[in-house]
C-alpha cells in the first residue's frame, strides 16, 4: 500500500485522464461494473438506470462507460480506483489488468520519490552558543562515495550531542581518496580568520583548557579530483602561528593578506573572505620538524608551480600532436579522393569516345582520321582534356574490324533477349492481374460474410480503434478532418502516423489503398468517411435544432420523435433502430392476438405519409395519443384507417385520391412488418367493423 499524498493523487488523476478511453474499451459488458459503482455509492441510482437504459437502446457499452467516467472526474478520489480495479472487475474484464499495472507503476514511482526527499535536521551553529541556536540541514539520501568528492559528514540525530561524540566524529580517518586533506577541526558560522596576535592565541588556549568543546556542526570540504590540487594547497599555506606551550593549536586561515596593525585581526574576523567565497579550514598539529620545513616553503612553492606549468605544457602538446595527425590524415584522404575522381573521369571519357567511334564504324574506315589541331599557348584545363581525347582516338583507331563486328553482334543479341523478356513479363502480368482480380472479388465476399459490423463500437466517437494487418492504433477524427496527409493515427508505440504510413506499417509492400485496408471493427475507413449525419429531421424533413441518434445517422427534432427525446440525454437510440432490432426476432401472430396487446414504444412510430386533414381524424391527434400512451393496437389501426377512408371519400374525382390509396397500401404493408401479424382473408385488406 502507498501513503497517499497530494502530488501522488494529482499524478493518479492525470493518469486516469489518459487511460479513460482504454478503460472504456476494456469494459465490454455492464455487469458487474455498473453494479459495483452503485453499491459503493460512486454513482447515483438515476445515473445507473440511465446507463442501463442506454445499453438496452443499442448504445455501445464503451461509450456509456466513457460517459460515466467523464462525469466522475469531478469527484475523483482513491475509492473510485479501488472499486474500478477490484478483484471481481479484474476477473471479469481481463483487459483491465494492464491498465491496473500502469497505475501501480505511477504509485510506486511517487512512493520512491517520497523516500528520497531530504530530511531536515538541526545542529548547533556556534562555539560559544552551544545548542541554543539551531539551523536545519537538508541531508541528501545516502550515495556511494565518489573519488572526486570528500566524505560526507555523518548524520546528526539529536541537536544536543555530547562533546565526546563530536570529538570522535572529528577524529575519524579520512577516506583513501583524499589522504592529504584532514577533516576540519574548528568551524565558525559563515567565516574563517587568520590569527597572528599572541593575545588572541593565548585567549583561545585558555578557553580550550577551561571549557570543553561543544558539539560542532560538521561540514564537507570540496576537494578537486586532481592530485595536484592538494599539493598546491599544502605548499601555498601562509606562515605558521607562533609556537604555543600547549603543543597543538587549531589554526584558522583566510586567503586575505596578513594585517600590519595589531588591531586588524579583530576586524578581519568580523568580515567575510573576498577571494572566491571558499572556506579553507584545517587543523594542523604542528611539530618542530614540520615548522622548520614550512618556514622553507616560499622558495619551494615557485618550483612546484614551475613543475605544474611544465606538466600542463606537456598535456597541451599531446592534443596538438593528435590534431596535427588528424589534419594530415584528412589531407591524405582528400588527395586520394581527388585522384580517384580524375581516374573515373578519364575512364568515362575513353568509354564515350570508344562508343562514338564504334557507332561511326564505316566512316572511320573509309576516311582517314585527321589529327585534331591544338592551339599552342592555351594554358587552361581544357588543353589537358584535348590531349587525352587525342590519345583515346588513336587507341580506338587501332582496333580491328573483327572486334568491332563481334561487339555489334553481341549488342544485337542483347537487344533481342531484352525484347523477349519484356514481352514475357507483360504476358505474366496480364495473367496475374486477371487471377488477382477474381481472387479479390472472392476474398471481398468472404470477408464481408466472415466479419460483420460490430454493434459495440460507437462510430460517432472522436477516437476510433483501427487495424491494418498486424498494426493497431487509434484514429483521431479531429485531425483526420484536415486531410489524409496529417498524422492522425497513433500506433501502439505512441508514434503518430498518416493513413498511408499506417498502411505501410501493417501491410508492408502490399500497401495500395488505405481507405480499403484500414478497418474499424469490420468497416473500412472509406465507408466510415461516407457516413454523415443528415441535416434534416427524419420525420418533418426540416432543419433546426436536431438531436442525433447514437446508432444511426438519423436526426430528429425533440418533439418529432416518438417518444419525445430529452435534450439533456447524450446517449439514446431512435425508434427506427429499435424496430430494426425487434423485426429480426419478431414472430408472426394472428390479427386478434396482436390487436389485443398494448402499444409498445417501437410500435408507436409509423411514418407520416400525408398532410394533416382536419375532418374526423388528423395526424396531430394520433401523435398526441401515441405520446401519452393511450392507444391500444386496435385503436391506433382504427384511427389511421379512418383517416385514409375520409381522404378517399373527399378526393374521389382528383388525382390526389390515388395518392391516398398508395399511402394506405404502403401503411398496411409496414403495419404487417412492424406488428408481425398475417391476414386471415387473402382477398383485400382487413377492415374493422
Swiss-Prot record:
GO terms for molecular function: DNA binding; DNA-binding transcription factor activity, RNA polymerase II-specific; zinc ion binding. Residues 131-216, 231-385 are annotated as: Disordered. Residues 525-529 are annotated as: Nuclear hormone receptor interaction. Residues 276-296 have a biased composition (Basic residues). GO terms for biological process: regulation of transcription by RNA polymerase II. Residues 314-325, 334-350 have a biased composition (Basic and acidic residues). This is Sp110 nuclear body protein. It comes from Homo sapiens (Human). The gene is SP110.
Amino acid at each position: 500500500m502507498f501513503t497517499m499524498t497530494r502530488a501522488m493523487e494529482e499524478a493518479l488523476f492525470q493518469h486516469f485522464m489518459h487511460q479513460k478511453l482504454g478503460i472504456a474499451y476494456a469494459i465490454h459488458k455492464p455487469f458487474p461494473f455498473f453494479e459495483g459503482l452503485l453499491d459503493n455509492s460512486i454513482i447515483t441510482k438515476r445515473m445507473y438506470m440511465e446507463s442501463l437504459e442506454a445499453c438496452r437502446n443499442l448504445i455501445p457499452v464503451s461509450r456509456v462507460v466513457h460517459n460515466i467516467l467523464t462525469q466522475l472526474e469531478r469527484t475523483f478520489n482513491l475509492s473510485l480506483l479501488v472499486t474500478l480495479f477490484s478483484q471481481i472487475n479484474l476477473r471479469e474484464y481481463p483487459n483491465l489488468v494492464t491498465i491496473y499495472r500502469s497505475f501501480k507503476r505511477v504509485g510506486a514511482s511517487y512512493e520512491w520519490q517520497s523516500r528520497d526527499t531530504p530530511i531536515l535536521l538541526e545542529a548547533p551553529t556556534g562555539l560559544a552558543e552551544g545548542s541554543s541556536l539551531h539551523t536545519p540541514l537538508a541531508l541528501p539520501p545516502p550515495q556511494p562515495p565518489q573519488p572526486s568528492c570528500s566524505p560526507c559528514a555523518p548524520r546528526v540525530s539529536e541537536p544536543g550531542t555530547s562533546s565526546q561524540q563530536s570529538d570522535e566524529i572529528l577524529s575519524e580517518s579520512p577516506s583513501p581518496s583524499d589522504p592529504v586533506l584532514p577533516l576540519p577541526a574548528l568551524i565558525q558560522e559563515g567565516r574563517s580568520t587568520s590569527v597572528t596576535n599572541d593575545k588572541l592565541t593565548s585567549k583561545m588556549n585558555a578557553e580550550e583548557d577551561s571549557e570543553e568543546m561543544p558539539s560542532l556542526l560538521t561540514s564537507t570540504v570540496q576537494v578537486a579530483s586532481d592530485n595536484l590540487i592538494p599539493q598546491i594547497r599544502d605548499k601555498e599555506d601562509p606562515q605558521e602561528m607562533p609556537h604555543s606551550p600547549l603543543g597543538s593549536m587549531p589554526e584558522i586561515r583566510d586567503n586575505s593578506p596578513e594585517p600590519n596593525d595589531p588591531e586588524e585581526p579583530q576586524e578581519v574576523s568580523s568580515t567575510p573572505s573576498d577571494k572566491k567565497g571558499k572556506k579553507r579550514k584545517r587543523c594542523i598539529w604542528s611539530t618542530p620538524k614540520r615548522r622548520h620545513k614550512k618556514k622553507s616553503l616560499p622558495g619551494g612553492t615557485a618550483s612546484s608551480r614551475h613543475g605544474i606549468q611544465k606538466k600542463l605544457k606537456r598535456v597541451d602538446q599531446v592534443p596538438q600532436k593528435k590534431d596535427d595527425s588528424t589534419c594530415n590524415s584528412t589531407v591524405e584522404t582528400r588527395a586520394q579522393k581527388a585522384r580517384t575522381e580524375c581516374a573515373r573521369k578519364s575512364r568515362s571519357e575513353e568509354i564515350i569516345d570508344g562508343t562514338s567511334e564504334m557507332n561511326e564504324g564505316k566512316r572511320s574506315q573509309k576516311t582517314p582520321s585527321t589529327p585534331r589541331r591544338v592551339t599552342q599557348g592555351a594554358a587552361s584545363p581544357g588543353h589537358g582534356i584535348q590531349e587525352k581525347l587525342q590519345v583515346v582516338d588513336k587507341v580506338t583507331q587501332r582496333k580491328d574490324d573483327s572486334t568491332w563486328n563481334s561487339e555489334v553482334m553481341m549488342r544485337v543479341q542483347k537487344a533481342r533477349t531484352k525484347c523477349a523478356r519484356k514481352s514475357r513479363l507483360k504476358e505474366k502480368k496480364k495473367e496475374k492481374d486477371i487471377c488477382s482480380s477474381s481472387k479479390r472479388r472472392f476474398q471481398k465476399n468472404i470477408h464481408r460474410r466472415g466479419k460483420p459490423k460490430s454493434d459495440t463500437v460507437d462510430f460517432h466517437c472522436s477516437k476510433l480503434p483501427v487495424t491494418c494487418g498486424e498494426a493497431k492504433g487509434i484514429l483521431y477524427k479531429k485531425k483526420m478532418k484536415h486531410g489524409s496527409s496529417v498524422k492522425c493515427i497513433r500506433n501502439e508505440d505512441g508514434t503518430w502516423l498518416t493513413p498511408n504510413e499506417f498502411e505501410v506499417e501493417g501491410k508492408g509492400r502490399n500497401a495500395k489503398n488505405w481507405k480499403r485496408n484500414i478497418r474499424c471493427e469490420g468497416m473500412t475507413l472509406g465507408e466510415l468517411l461516407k457516413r454523415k449525419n443528415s441535416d434534416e429531421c427524419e420525420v418533418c424533413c426540416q432543419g433546426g435544432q436536431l438531436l442525433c441518434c447514437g446508432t444511426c445517422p438519423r436526426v430528429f427534432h425533440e418533439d418529432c420523435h416518438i417518444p419525445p427525446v430529452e435534450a439533456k440525454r447524450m446517449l439514446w437510440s431512435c425508434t427506427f433502430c429499435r424496430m430494426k432490432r425487434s423485426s429480426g426476432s419478431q414472430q408472426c401472430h394472428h390479427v386478434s392476438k396482436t390487436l389485443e396487446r398494448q402499444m409498445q414504444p417501437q410500435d408507436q412510430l409509423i411514418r407520416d405519409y400525408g398532410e394533416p386533414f382536419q375532418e374526423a381524424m388528423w395526424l396531430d391527434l394520433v401523435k398526441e395519443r401515441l405520446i401519452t400512451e393511450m392507444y391500444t393496437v386496435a385503436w391506433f389501426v382504427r384511427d389511421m384507417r379512418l383517416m385514409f377512408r375520409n381522404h378517399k371519400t373527399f378526393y374521389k374525382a382528383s388525382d390526389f385520391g390515388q395518392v391516398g390509396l398508395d399511402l394506405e397500401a404502403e401503411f398496411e404493408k409496414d403495419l404487417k412488418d412492424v406488428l408481425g401479424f398475417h391476414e386471415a382473408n387473402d382477398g383485400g385488406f382487413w377492415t374493422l367493423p
